[in-house]
């Protein structure tokens, strides 16, 4: 078997993601579809290296909301606990609220608006998504190293958790 050095992308990655069912509750087909795509994309391609565990993966990730905090329960592939991080949801509340509002506008526009209007709304949606992704990267700094694309996919999952958490 070939040994890979610490920090190699084969070890610093997520191989499975679960969402806390109590955090997400029931949602419509659009949200379920977004969740499935985000999990698939995240597992297919990511960079995820918990501080102090660089090169010890691959890892599994369980996301949830507990005590009004975002929970990252990180384990090795065999289930051995690595670390659990609890992040305040406060920095994400406005971004997620704005994201939901623009997503509603986007889904409504798809039915009736011109292609130019739909494209403009989608650009705004992507901009807010990027802002949430950067905020997540900042909040994880010193805890878990992630690249921007991994942060984007994780932010999508955070919005799914907020869907129930915000009473949507």
UniProtKB/Swiss-Prot annotation:
Belongs to the UPF0262 family. InterPro entries: UCP032146. It comes from Bradyrhizobium sp. (strain BTAi1 / ATCC BAA-1182). It comes from the Bacteria. This is UPF0262 protein BBta_0898. Disulfide bonds: none annotated.
């Amino acid at each position: 078997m070939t040994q890979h050095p610490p920090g190699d992308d084969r070890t610093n990655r997520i191989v499975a993601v679960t969402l806390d069912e109590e955090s997400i509750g029931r949602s419509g087909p659009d949200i379920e579809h977004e969740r499935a795509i985000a999990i698939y994309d995240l597992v297919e391609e990511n960079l995820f290296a918990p501080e102090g565990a660089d090169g010890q993966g691959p890892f599994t990730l369980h996301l949830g909301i507990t005590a009004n905090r975002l929970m990252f329960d990180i384990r090795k592939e065999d289930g051995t606990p690595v670390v659990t991080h609890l992040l305040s949801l406060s920095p994400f509340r406005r971004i997620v609220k704005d994201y939901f509002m623009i997503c509603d506008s986007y889904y409504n526009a798809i039915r009736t608006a011109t292609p130019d209007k739909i494209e403009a709304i989608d650009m705004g949606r992507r901009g807010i998504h990027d802002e949430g992704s950067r905020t997540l990267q900042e909040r994880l700094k010193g805890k878990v190293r992630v690249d921007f694309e991994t942060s984007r996919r994780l932010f999508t999952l955070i919005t799914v958790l907020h869907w129930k958490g915000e009473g949507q």
